[in-house]
Every structure is written in structure tokens, then in C-alpha cells.
């Protein structure tokens, strides 16, 4: 058994939630602040240097052909809930990363001890499920959260599995910026000429401790593929919901009974997947 954690990465999450697509440069703008700020940017806008967090004025200076759209947080939250509901059919142990939202959704799923073939199959099912929702997803599979995240970043809307023991070799050529660095930490590493995870992992532990303290020691472990951090599950809702829309009025009770039975089976499977029992239905 190898892979136990799946990382799901959905680029342009907010744009997908609001139905904004296309190759033109565009941004979603948060107008709630005194100065309008970019909340998410399309690939074309990012290529011009536009990034989440910068002011709309600066974004327009970098990309004069930019098209701004207002950020609709209610739509983003609805899509987040739909995404979680879809992923909860695979496991009830899911952690969300908030630091990249709403530009990118990143979620970790604890699959438990899983053979590589089974993990790859689950990863493909996750990708297909989200794709049907209009959410192109990249899925990384590994034994640790950091390696799974790095694998998702390399999967290009596909599935990439890192086998047990291959973590360090996979991570070595990747940029050191994948580590959770503060701006000043990144500047120090750049001055030292440390560009890759492999280079960072090869630094003496004493030197890393002297420069970065406890967090540096954690980064060294992550860069080496040794990540023992557990998935911190998001609390699941206290209810499940399923429905069916009839094209025409129901004339026979048999039809209604069949539909209700099918919905009951669907709800039962969802509850079983999250180790819950129904207490009330309506």
C-alpha cells in the first residue's frame, strides 16, 4: 500500500462558480474594500502579471485590455458546498486550504491505506465527477499532504500518483517556492541561491535551524518528502438532501414510490460513506 492522501486542485475556481470562462484576460474584483482589489485572475491576465491581491488600478495598468467582473461570494460559496458534497462520497475526511481561495480551490482527502491501483482509480473518478460539474481538477496522490499537493500542481487536469519511496526524487527538481514561505524567507533563499526543493533538502539541518528555526526544520522534512501531518477534516453538515424533478405531473403512485425508493437508496449510500445513520426524514 502506498498512496493514502489525495490533493484536489481546481484552478480558476471562482470564475467557474460564476460561469465566467474564455481565453480573454479578466479578473474577479472584490469591491467591498475601500480600494477595489483583484480576487481572482484568468490565465491570460496572470500571464500579463496580474495577481490576486493587487489593486484593480494596478491590474489595469499591467493589462489594459482587462475585463473586470464583480466577485459574487454567494456563488463561490454555493460551488464550494457542491464540491464538498461531491467529494464526501469518496471520504468524510476532507481538509480545505483557505489561503488560495477564491482563485484556486485546494482540498486534501484522506483515503486511508490504499493500494496504488485503487488510489489511481479513485483519483480518476474524482476528476471525472468534478469535470461533470464544470470544474477541471488536477489530482495528486501520495503518502503525505505536501507531496500530494506538489503532484496535483504537476498533474495538468489529470491524475499523478507518487509511489512510496519516490517522494524525494519527485520533489527535488521542483521550485522551493512550493514550501509555505513568507516573503522574507523566500528572499533569503533567493539570495542564498537556493532554487529547488532538492537543494533546500540537502542543506545542513543546523544551517536551516539557524536561519529559519522550527519552521525551517519542517520545510526540510517536507522538501525531503517526509510529511506526517494529518488531514484535518472539515465538519460535514448534519443533513443530506436529494431531489428529483418530474417533467410532467405524477399520475400514478407507483411512479412516485419508485422515485422515493431511489432517492432513499441514494441518501442511504451517502450516509453510509460518512459513517452516519438517519434520525429523521421528510
Predicted regions and their residues:
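Glycine-rich, histidine-containing beta strand-loop boundary motifs that form or position
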Residues: 98, 111, 141-143, 201-204, ...
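A structural signal for the main folded, soluble domain(s) of proteins
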Residues: 90, 162-169
